[in-house]
Design a protein with these regions (language model features):
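Short, structured coil segments at secondary-structure junctions
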Residues: 10-12
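Cell-envelope/extracellular polymer assembly enzymes that use nucleotide-activated donors
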Residues: 136
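Acceptor/aglycone-binding surface of glycosyltransferases and processive sugar-polymer synthases
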Residues: 16-36, 41, 53-131, 157-168, ...
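A conserved acidic beta->alpha catalytic loop
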Residues: 1-5, 49
C-alpha cells in the first residue's frame, strides 16, 4: 500500500515476495537467497523507521572473521520514547535469560539491526517463523562458536503501530531460548 515494491523495482532492486508469514520466515528466505547470490556480507535491518541505514557501514566494518555483529540500541543513542518501558524491561530480562542459559555475551537480544559474514549464515541453524528469530540466531551463534561483536547504534521512535506484542512475543522468545538450551 505504500508503493515500496514499485519504488524498489524502479531503482533496479530485485524484489523477493515472501513465501511464509512472519519475520523469521522472511529472514530465512532472505538468507537462502543471499547464499544463492554468493555475496560475502549481509545486513538485516528492520524497516520500521527506528534504525538508521547510514550506520550500516559501521556494522559491516565491525563484523568479526566468520562472525556477526549486532547493533546495540541499549548502549547507543536510544532516543526519547523510542522504546516503551515494557519493551525495555522485557528486552533486559530476555537478554539476561539468553546469557544465563547459553553463556555467550549479548547486550541487546531483540535488536533488529544485524550484519553477518557468509560463513556465519552458512552455519546458522534456524527454523523460527516469527519474532523469536533473533533469539534463535543468538543461540545458534552460542552453540556453534560463531563470533559476535556489538556496535552501539541509534534507535528512534517508530512511526505507526508495532507488530511486536510485548507479552505474547516475549513469551515466545523466552520459550525459544529455553528449548534451544535443552535441545
Amino acid at each position: 500500500t505504500d508503493n515500496t515494491v514499485s519504488i524498489a523495482e524502479e531503482l533496479g532492486c530485485e524484489v523477493i515476495q515472501q513465501w511464509g508469514e512472519g519475520k523469521g520466515a522472511g529472514m530465512r528466505q532472505g538468507f537462502k537467497k543471499f547464499l544463492e547470490v554468493g555475496d560475502d556480507e549481509l545486513v538485516m535491518l528492520d524497516c520500521d523507521g527506528t534504525y538508521h541505514p547510514e550506520e550500516i557501514t559501521r556494522l559491516l566494518d565491525s563484523i568479526p572473521k566468520n562472525g556477526i555483529v549486532i547493533g546495540d540500541r541499549l548502549h547507543g543513542n536510544l532516543q526519547s520514547n523510542a522504546m516503551t518501558s515494557t519493551n525495555w524491561i522485557g528486552n533486559q530480562l530476555l537478554t539476561w535469560l539468553a546469557v544465563a542459559l547459553h553463556g555467550k555475551p549479548i547486550y541487546d537480544l531483540c535488536s533488529g539491526f544485524w550484519a553477518f559474514s557468509r560463513n556465519a549464515i552458512e552455519r546458522l541453524q534456524l527454523n523460527s517463523m516469527r519474532f523469536e528469530i533473533e533469539a534463535e540466531m543468538y543461540t545458534s551463534c552460542a552453540h556453534r562458536n560463531i563470533p559476535i561483536a556489538h556496535v552501539p547504534i541509534t534507535y528512534s521512535k517508530r512511526v505507526g503501530e508495532a507488530k511486536l506484542g510485548s507479552i505474547k512475543d516475549g513469551t515466545s522468545i523466552a520459550r525459544k531460548l529455553i528449548i534451544r538450551r535443552i535441545f
